[in-house]
Amino acid sequence: MIPAHQRKNPPEESVQIVNRDNLVVGAVPRSRMRREALIHRASYILVFNTRDELFLQKRTATKDIYPGYWDVAAGGVVLAGESYEDSAGRELTEELGVTASLVHLFDHFYEDSANRVWGRIFRCTHDGPFTLQAEEVASGRFITVAAALALSRTEPFTPDGVEILRRIQEGG
């Protein structure tokens, strides 16, 4: 039998669906969550170096939401039966090849026409190197939070990420 990660069409992920109070109400395939803009959970991991610069990532053009945008965090949807913490550790390892201690900063609700998400925001420290996941991350670089916010006025950034950065800059 061929392992799932080696098949051409692996089974679709099942993601946790929550209500506006962030209580789990079920699980659905990722495509349905996106199609119906269902409220879901996601982990966000802000990676800072020892100079307190943020690792900014360029999303690949194949991402299902905000393709080609700059993103301030590693992370992704919380899978059915998974905790925020487990999701954060998994996503950090998958996307950047990093294992690091995570510090929970805050929880954050974000909503726009394409996305409704309860996010748990974590922070970690890592100077590199990184092993970028080719399917998700096109490139990355360290930048100050102030410079990232300035860049977000002229370059496409994930809107939830910009809100998180503003909250970080205001002191959480």
Language-model-derived ranges and their functions:
Residues 2-44, 50:
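Acidic, metal-coordinating catalytic segment for phosphate/diphosphate chemistry
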Residues 9, 71-73, 132-136:
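Short glycine-enriched loop/turn motifs at secondary-structure junctions
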Residues 20, 59, 145:
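Residues immediately flanking
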Residues 24, 29-31, 80, 106-109, ...:
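Nudix hydrolase/Nudix homology domain
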